[in-house]
Design a protein with these regions (language model features):
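Amphipathic alpha-helical dimerization/coiled-coil segments
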Residues: 78-127
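Beta-hairpin "wing" of winged helix-turn-helix
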Residues: 56-65, 72-74
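N-terminal helix-turn-helix DNA-binding core of bacterial DNA-binding proteins
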Residues: 4-45, 68-77
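Alpha-helical residues within the helix-turn-helix
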Residues: 38, 55-56
Length: 127
């Protein structure tokens, strides 16, 4: 890590939608884009743009499974230099009313794409 990548990391945190996405990803090992969209009640284009920015800043990683794109926080390994920063950020999120609302909504909307598309359950079961 150098100062340029560190600056990009902190710049990635300077937007409320990106902070809300990070808060959700701190709650789950990984999330499908459709779960993030449904939880935050934002358009797909907005969420995708912010996820792309977080990916550029090396804050999130993604993987494709069938038609779905999943995102995760790779920084949650103790060996990563910013691991403890994210732990501190999680504690800060616990004191944020908007963040608590998002977490509560996530528990209600989790796996939205699977629930709204019965064929997805068959695809996921095959893997």
């Amino acid at each position: 890590m150098n100062t340029t990548s560190l600056a990009l990391f902190y710049k990635s945190l300077s937007e409320p939608v990106r902070l809300r996405i990070i808060n959700l990803l701190l709650q789950q090992e990984e999330l499908c884009v459709c779960d993030i969209i449904t939880t935050l009640t934002l358009p797909q284009s907005v969420v995708s743009r912010h996820l792309a920015y977080l990916k550029k800043g090396a804050i999130v990683t993604s993987r494709r499974q069938g038609n779905w794109q999943y995102y995760a926080l790779p920084l949650m390994t103790p060996s990563h230099p910013l691991h403890y920063f994210l732990i501190s950020l999680r504690q800060t999120f616990e004191q944020c009313a908007d963040c608590a609302h998002d977490v509560a909504r996530l528990s209600q909307t989790m796996n939205y794409c699977l629930k709204s598309n019965p064929e997805a359950l068959l695809i996921q079961g095959d893997q």
